[in-house]
Amino acid sequence: YMTWDQIKEIEKEDFVFIGNHSHSHDYLVNYNFEKFKKDIDQSIKIFEEKIGYNPLFFSYPFGEYSLEQKNYISNKFTYAFGQHSGVIDFNKDKLELPRFPINEKYGDLKRFEFLVKLLPLQYKKIEPEDKLITRMNNPPKVFVEFFNEQQNLKRINCFSNEGNEWDKSEIKLENKKLIIKFRDKFLSRRGRVNCSLNDVDGWRWFGIQFVVEKN
């Protein structure tokens, strides 16, 4: 971990941006809404005391959030990152931006070189908007609506981890809408979908992460 003095030191650099990652770094979707707000507000208070401002950027712990929590974050931050893979473009929701993990497990140079060459697979919207899955909507009904300008959609492939097993997803294209049908319920804490398209100018990619409510 970094000390506050170290954070203040690097924060002075022109290309360094400090982000907020919550106070507890806990599984915040398990919190009731009041406890969630208290955690976020406490983190903001500490940042304001230590560096004089609350950062523009927030990163959801473990990439988990409900729609209610996302709406609260929108009143406190300008940008927020999930933990679903993908490439940022101008059409992405600025409160659920994608990010690829680069760490000791997923950080070899070959993978890094592949990731930095990826292009965004842009879309108008993804349903459902709420990424928190309950017993009532597991598996969720998922569709992705693309822009008319996106060509070669028949080349798209998706993989997902329902039933605790990564496999190729069953997909259906209706004009510019992609419908993803899951084989089973999501059994692990996080349900993931990764879609890629080998386009004329390179590989395009987007991902979705759901968090499965535990009762």
Which role does the model predict for each range below?
Residues 84, 95-98, 102:
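Extended amphipathic alpha-helical segments with heptad-repeat/coiled-coil character used for oligomerization
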Residues 14-18, 74-80:
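Glycine-enriched alpha-helix->loop->beta-strand junction motifs that scaffold or abut catalytic
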Residues 62, 84-85, 146:
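Active-site proximal loops enriched in glycine and acidic residues that flank catalytic Cys/His/Asp
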Residues 1-68, 91-98:
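Metal-dependent polysaccharide deacetylase catalytic core of the NodB/CE4 family, i.e.
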Residues 1-2, 99-215:
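Terminal accessory/targeting
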Residues 3, 77-86:
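Acidic, His- and aromatic-enriched active-site or binding-groove loops in soluble protein domains
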